[in-house]
């Protein structure tokens, strides 16, 4: 397809952040065009079809649906009236290698769990919940932590002042911007192992690495309205696509952006498929490294910072078809299982099942499961480029290790497996266009680890590379922050629906995921 038009705003990438920005801007009346290289929206939070199953590609835990939460704010700004979902209870279950089982509840039962399993941890959880509320309150004000213009600096100062006046945080909270979360943990090795495992999936590091303020908020995700979404996590992206289209915007799939360049006061965007667009504003739902690859005229500072691959993690995935009759009724959909040894590399596994009630996710008699483990992406590229036989053997070894780890806590699992599709970091580069298959954003070691949102005037970066970092609710806030910034520069603001979206399931089976082609 070859055509030329001049939309005001172009969004590169239909990940959650890009779609959040596009939907909010469309709802406010601005013309938006989204370009996505794949056939499915959502990026790492997409769902894809394989052999009759709908698998969640990467991110499998949807949080932020509690009243006043990030996804409720997103729904209001996008004009979404309801989320087809059911809240998880418990939100997840963590299985430690010593046999300790820790259910994560969002209600008062969580305190019963803490008292029973980790009695010395109660002061920590009191601090954690209070601190998490403060940070989420701040994040929901959509501040820009890395201002590069007078306008964004002014917004940051105003948001911080309003936050201090409303929340009354202790001045000591400033210290938690730099000291690690481990400082607050009791001297209980089993509890510390549990916290490290939870932080790894929520903040990309362990308690000795993650700064305390962020760690407190990351540990709060199970309390923030975790839900089973009809059709899988990709439904969030699908509803955002529909919101953009409903307001007159457009979303083009199978359009991979090849280059961007300045054209006077506008941006010219070219895709591999021959589409050429011009826009006055550009939103890149990419990693900084992905942006550098399509921008030959990128500033020297950006090129310098992207010369080396990013620090962080890749993911090794298993997409598993399960015999539903072999799964015990009532099994929680989210499970984290640990084996002895260093976390990651198949010794810590996060498993998410399609809900029992959602018949759209798999053929009759089956259920879809996504399993993931943190892995060093460099390892997979080295093998793939030097020894393909060793690469395939390593895939088999990791597959066996992950299944063995999961079976430690879920003895029914081996007998339920009917098919397994493994995936390495190479797949995340191929399908999600994440250079090197780097996923999850930066390990949150300090508050300025992320990139600035405004790269140059008229070009904004959104996604897990900017504050507040990884997760579906965090990237949604990153997108909304850019949308609000653009609207305020035009003398407008986000348009909020008077009520939050409802959270309920439609009548009948789960709503099917749609593929956009």
Regions found by a protein language model. Give the residues of each.
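N-terminal glycine-rich phosphate/pyrophosphate-binding loop and immediately adjacent elements
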Residues: 4-146, 443
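A conserved FAD-binding loop/helix module that cradles the flavin
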Residues: 59, 464-487
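Active-site/ligand-binding neighborhood in enzyme catalytic cores
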Residues: 129-247, 431-443
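A glycine-rich dinucleotide-binding beta-alpha-beta segment and adjacent secondary-structure elements
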Residues: 191-205, 350, 408-468
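A conserved beta-strand/loop element that lines the FAD pocket in flavoprotein oxidoreductases
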Residues: 244-257
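Mid-domain catalytic core of redox enzymes
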Residues: 256-364, 502-504
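Active-site-proximal substrate-binding core of FAD-dependent oxidoreductases
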Residues: 262, 487-517
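C-terminal segments that line or cap access tunnels to active or ligand-binding sites in enzymes
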Residues: 323-426
